[in-house]
């Protein structure tokens, strides 16, 4: 049984904003103490999560003893990473005793002669509701509730049968037709809930420089949601931040490439594309492109024929199989096997569409990804790759699976090369809220 109770990094509290103080004391306020739920939604990095989780445990410890409580994230891993690590530091700094039973995903928290138990859950999919069946709880904290299925949240809130129990919701905005927006935020009176809407300026730990940096990172629907904190619909062009004047460049002939990758979107009926990405002075350039559509030409190619074309692509651009790796859609099993049989180094792409679109838009805005006139099919797709309006009307974010082959390959590249590098540079934050 694996347990931990000590952390080496002490949490330093900074002065709270007005909204953070509301979250911290709402359950003691004569105006709100009888409310069943609190909802803290709004922009990213607004100081919602840390104050919500701390207030939740503080409320539980001041009002209950020997009671079970629930805490959930999209996954248990994300909950531990985004909430529990800092929460334990905060609690220990405030003289709570915390024992983390990692094998059972349970925190045992004690102070002033009281002990309560906080069970950790992942609200990943429809089957997740089975995880909370049968347990009686005094409260439930949902981190990023907009990423969870309605069935899980409904089952979890139905377990709150202890007298005085409350639900705590925290999230960034999604579609205005998202189930949580319709069922909770739009029905505060019916749900007997209080809502506190956050913006980044409500986080006192963020400097003006940091605020400006985040403001420049997002575009389109993600800017409306993550910066302005609006429940906005995904419609129109997916990459509406694409600026041809800034993002399509001529590359000097004497440019020396520091590193190169090829990203591949493979299709049998649909198009197959190879995208050459080359690094120079901190920016990646798509300086060559292969595009073939059997549907458009009326003649399909076999895996071996595509690999023949890839060998020609390597020869034409003076590429080495030893140095230039291929990023390929993980679903293209037979094609990947054939590539490896011919001596190519293949790595699986990350095919999370929404995360990939959001991250690639950020890299475009930061000037980390640029294209050339050689990317002719990609440039066409930037003007025709659309959000799915029918899905948006259902409260879902989805793209229309048309005019997306080159941009899918670009997304694979961004998530495999740029995102991994970004994750490696993350350091443990030692500042406060």
Model-found features: residue ranges?
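Inter-Walker segment of RecA-like/P-loop motor cores
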Residues: 80-138
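Conserved P-loop
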Residues: 35-105, 181
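Pre-P-loop entry segment of helicase/translocase ATPase cores
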Residues: 1-37
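Mg2+-dependent endonuclease catalytic cores in nucleic-acid-processing enzymes, primarily RNase H-like
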Residues: 281-401, 420-421, 430-433
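Catalytic acidic motif of RecA-like/P-loop NTPases
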Residues: 77, 146-147
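ASCE P-loop NTPase helicase motor core
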Residues: 139, 147-217
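ATPase catalytic-site recognition across NTP-hydrolyzing enzymes
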Residues: 203-266
């Amino acid at each position: 049984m694996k347990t931990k109770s000590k952390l080496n990094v002490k949490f330093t509290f900074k002065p709270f904003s007005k909204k953070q103080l509301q979250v911290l004391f709402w359950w003691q306020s004569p105006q709100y103490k009888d409310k069943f739920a609190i909802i803290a939604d709004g922009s990213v990095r607004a100081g919602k999560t840390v104050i919500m989780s701390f207030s939740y445990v503080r409320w539980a410890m001041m009002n209950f003893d020997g009671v079970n409580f629930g805490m959930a994230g999209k996954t248990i891993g994300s909950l531990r990473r985004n909430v529990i690590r800092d929460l334990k530091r905060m609690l220990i700094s405030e003289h709570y005793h915390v024992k983390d039973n990692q094998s059972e995903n349970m925190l045992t928290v004690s102070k002033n002669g009281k002990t309560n138990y906080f069970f950790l859950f992942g609200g990943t999919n429809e089957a997740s509701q089975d995880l909370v069946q049968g347990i009686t709880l005094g409260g439930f904290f949902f981190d990023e509730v907009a990423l969870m299925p309605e069935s899980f949240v409904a089952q979890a809130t139905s377990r709150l049968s202890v007298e005085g129990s409350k639900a705590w919701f925290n999230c960034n905005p999604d579609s205005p037709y998202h189930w949580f927006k319709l069922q909770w935020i739009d029905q505060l009176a019916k749900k007997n809930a209080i809502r506190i809407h956050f913006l980044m300026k409500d986080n006192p730990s963020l400097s003006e420089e940091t605020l400006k940096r985040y403001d420049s990172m997002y575009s389109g629907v993600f800017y409306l949601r993550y910066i302005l904190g609006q429940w906005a619909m995904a419609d129109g062009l997916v990459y509406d931040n694409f600026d041809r004047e800034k993002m399509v460049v001529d590359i000097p002939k004497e440019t020396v490439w520091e590193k190169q990758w090829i990203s591949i979107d493979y299709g049998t009926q649909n198009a197959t594309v190879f995208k050459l990405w080359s690094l120079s002075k901190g920016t990646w350039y798509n300086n060559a492109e292969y595009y073939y559509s059997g549907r458009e030409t009326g003649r399909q190619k076999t895996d071996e024929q595509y690999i023949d074309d890839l060998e020609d692509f390597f020869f034409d651009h003076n590429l080495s199989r030893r140095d230039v790796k291929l990023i390929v859609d993980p679903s293209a099993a037979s094609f990947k096997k054939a590539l490896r049989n011919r001596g190519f180094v293949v790595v699986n792409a990350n095919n999370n569409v929404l995360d990939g679109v959001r991250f690639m838009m950020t890299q475009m805005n930061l000037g980390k990804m640029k294209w050339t006139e050689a990317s002719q099919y990609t440039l066409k797709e930037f003007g025709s790759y659309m959000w799915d309006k029918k899905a948006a009307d259902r409260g879902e974010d989805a793209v229309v699976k048309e005019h997306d082959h080159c941009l899918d390959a670009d997304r694979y590249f961004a998530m495999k090369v740029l995102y991994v590098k970004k994750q490696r540079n993350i350091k443990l934050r030692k500042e406060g809220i």
